[in-house]
């Protein structure tokens, strides 16, 4: 049951314990709540409806508003100290987890309000974009930050898309385990003195 229309919607759970449903959302706004029930109620509070943007990239997207150690973001302090968790701006950082097989579920992270602490650790590029967007549109904005420094673009694309580029060598099988190749050492011993 969604608080914006109080309509109950039902669905069935499949053999994997998964379910899916669609519900009509109102115009941008909130906060709202949604209650789920399997006989016992679970209510999610403080839900906003509005723009949601996926912000991805490499180190230019990964750098937080506070900057990296020894690499501060010039002029970021006023944005950090003036961050307001009551503002309709939400931040979600996907935790980095590598895999050699395509991932369909199980993303680790959580939505956070725009508090000074959370803004400081959030992607600077994503935050400054979302901050401007929220002020311009005057609607709630959600930012999903998913980046990894020095990652290849191929890692962000599915196999079907990549197969259209013959110059990219795709493995026939998915590597599930990693062995370690023994390294070699080269050392030239200094000549020993002769009598």
Which sequence ranges carry the predicted segments?
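Stable alpha-helical elements in mature extracytoplasmic
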Residues: 125-129
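Glycine-rich phosphate/pyrophosphate-binding loops
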Residues: 2, 130, 136-155
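Acidic, His- and aromatic-enriched active-site or binding-groove loops in soluble protein domains
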Residues: 161-180
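Short, flexible loop/turn elements at secondary-structure junctions
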Residues: 25-27, 93-96, 147-150
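Short secondary-structure boundary/capping segments
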Residues: 68-73, 157-164
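Extended acidic/polar, glycine-enriched regions
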Residues: 2-56
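N-terminal beta-rich core of secreted/periplasmic extracellular enzymes
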Residues: 36-121, 139-141
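Conserved small/polar residues in nucleotide/adenosyl-binding loops
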Residues: 187-195
